[in-house]
């Protein structure tokens, strides 16, 4: 199985969600100067920022990560976290990344997610990778 790549701010809501999912995962560093490069296909898990608009919805660290052509070539799907207080902009980062990278938007959850969200993501990610060609 391939990995989840995720970003979590200093609030660590996304980190706590990823820990509960319990699948292999790599964190995009909070420090914008630190870079990582992945070497296998992955699903990106990303929080949404910005309070409702498109500008700023995707964290800068995630933009930098995806601007690396090697990293961008290996993304296979996106899962987004958000806050329902933002209305129509709930999980906007997932919409934007899905569109720009041409990958499926697999799931969205609020804040740290519920136990049902954790189970849905765990099951959905496993099923997603089983459907992928071996060298996808």
Curated annotation (Swiss-Prot):
Domain of life: Bacteria
Pfam families (alphabetical): Flavodoxin_NdrI
GO biological process: protein modification process
Gene Ontology terms for molecular function: FMN binding
Gene3D superfamilies in the record: 3.40.50.360
Family, per entry: Belongs to the NrdI family.
Functional description taken from the UniProt entry: Probably involved in ribonucleotide reductase function.
Name of this protein: Protein NrdI
Organism per entry: Enterobacter sp. (strain 638)
């Amino acid at each position: 199985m391939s990995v989840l790549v995720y970003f979590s701010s200093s609030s660590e809501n996304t980190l706590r969600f990823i820990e509960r999912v319990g699948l292999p995962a790599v964190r995009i560093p909070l420090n914008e100067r630190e870079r990582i490069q992945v070497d296998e296909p992955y699903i990106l898990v990303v929080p949404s920022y910005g309070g409702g608009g498109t500008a700023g919805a995707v964290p800068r660290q995630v933009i930098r990560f995806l601007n690396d052509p090697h990293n961008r070539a290996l993304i296979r799907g996106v899962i987004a976290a958000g806050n329902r207080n933002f209305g129509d902009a709930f999980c906007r980062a997932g919409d934007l990344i899905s569109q720009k990278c041409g990958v499926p938007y697999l799931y969205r959850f609020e804040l740290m997610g519920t136990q049902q969200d954790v189970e849905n993501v765990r099951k959905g990610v496993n099923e997603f990778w089983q459907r992928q060609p071996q060298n996808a």
